[in-house]
């Protein structure tokens, strides 16, 4: 199936590893991504805080371009881009607003192509069951993960129309399909501080620190997310969160596509693990250690049962 792919600006810069791992995973799973030709910025956070009409026009331009493509949907990995694209479609349901938006565009947007996140496509169009069937050896067994969705992936629910906006589980199920253990993370939709990382680093340090502290306390080896800004605040700014908390955090923060790529044994250079600030080796080593311990326990149990059977046989 063909999808119009909107990578977003961060995918070309600060989160290039998210883009490359997304493309690699989709290719491996038979999802055909067609880049929207001449795509442009959706406006991100600044546009909609200044002018809703401008914000919708910026997003609608990309939707109009996608309408000329033979695709099932427009998909994007970035929750911020997703919000702007879906909000534009939602607002343009009002005819008067739609006319105003299209007056700003060379090509009017007709709202004929649905918009989804890449996560939604993997969760619904492919499904965790199909992923599990592809990987019967459960390659991420032993890895404990805290799935973090952030505050906009599923909100507002009437616009996003995907998963539960208070307790989403799409990423949880995909990680479990890979064999990972998902810890019961109660802060999965709490804010990490978002773009306050520029103006108020103290707020980001406090909010991100709370997330990291909770994940660590639950025994997670790593956090897994679907949002470039969340990943940046939890990973790149982890040192600032540590300083604010008076405790050194050492939790790798993966994109979920990187972990799916690892499970699929895709080439390392396509996953961009080297771009993570907190070394992923910390989590992967913990995973291997936990797996070895489970194997040792199983072997000891089998040995004890064999000894018990031998003892019974001798007694008889």
Regions picked out by a protein language model, each given a short descriptive name:
Residues 1-316:
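Iron-sulfur cluster-binding electron-transfer modules in prokaryotic oxidoreductases
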